[in-house]
């Protein structure tokens, strides 16, 4: 019954991805092997879980930016169901707990442009086979191609020169992360006027791409402190974006409109 209803968790794979990102060694063999033997590939994948974050010390071993690079790798792939662990609000490699309190929102890292772009890429690539290569035979970067339709490039170290081979169909592509950097594919070669920056994600596809309106965002300023001592007061700066109708309410009182 469990095998029919549940999914295997690829914990070892997550460990391999963490090591690959932090050591800048995204070899094809490391990235491609799920370490599950003959188990069905309907597993859950992650870069880190809450246990990895706290008990394994990944909170100080891996920055949020590195977690996002790992997320791009596992989410661009054909198989698995990726699970994103959102770290505590205002946490860092110096402070694992951040402003962690019951009811407090987590970190905004899941809203990062790279996360958003690769999530939409995954949906657009359903049904496409995958091909994993190291561009220019450079194992500090990896390219995950999905048929001839799209590709995600994750670069962990120095700026990466283009001009490498690809299965992408000929045409012009825009990096869906920054929305502006153009890449050209002609006769099996991918080129751009710009190098691929270190510690970055490039998401390339045209077929299946959809333009969405920016979602409304509300929150508090990044330096907001929540662990206020009893009897003390604090100033809280509310933030909002992509909306003209943000509101807050205190203790059941009437809602009050505010601007960013």
Residue ranges and their predicted role:
Residues 211-260:
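Low-complexity, disordered linker/stalk regions enriched in Pro/Thr/Ser/Gly
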Residues 3-213:
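Active-site-proximal helices and loops of the catalytic beta/alpha 8
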